[in-house]
């Protein structure tokens, strides 16, 4: 298991989480570092069967011109804006995905419709068939934000470029401080994901 996190407290929480789930220390390859400014060392494993990301939403980053020559971003001709690093994180994860791998990243809804550089990146991802599914989540689901978020599922190489949209925004139990998705809600979403078809008021399979 490999991972990288800039915030030291979150980094230590990730290590504790792995210990609690029985992952031996020798199988933990976690780094306390900047994912965007300091990419994974090339002397270690650099592509993975599965990539999971929950980056800070709309975080600031340098977006320095030199990143246009960075292999993670160079194919897109533009960079994620300085004020919103969402697509920088997404492209970082996609770059490190194996050709037959799957990636899932949690991001704010804004990544689905914002224009300018983000729109160009999104268009290339769609035309390349990289975006496999978009799952809209309920608002107030996470501790750090009350805004609605989505899970974007990506594939590096696949036949076709259709995209499955799942509306899970109403699949939650309301709590005092946070909303909660139960195992039943998650099972319903996974069934829709597995079927990969249009279901009225639940999911839509879009092709272009």
Regions found by a protein language model. Give the residues of each.
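S-adenosyl-L-methionine
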Residues: 9-45
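Conserved SAM-binding motif I beta-strand of class I
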Residues: 1-5
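A conserved structural/catalytic subdomain of Rossmann-like adenosyl-cofactor enzymes
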Residues: 37-38, 43-208
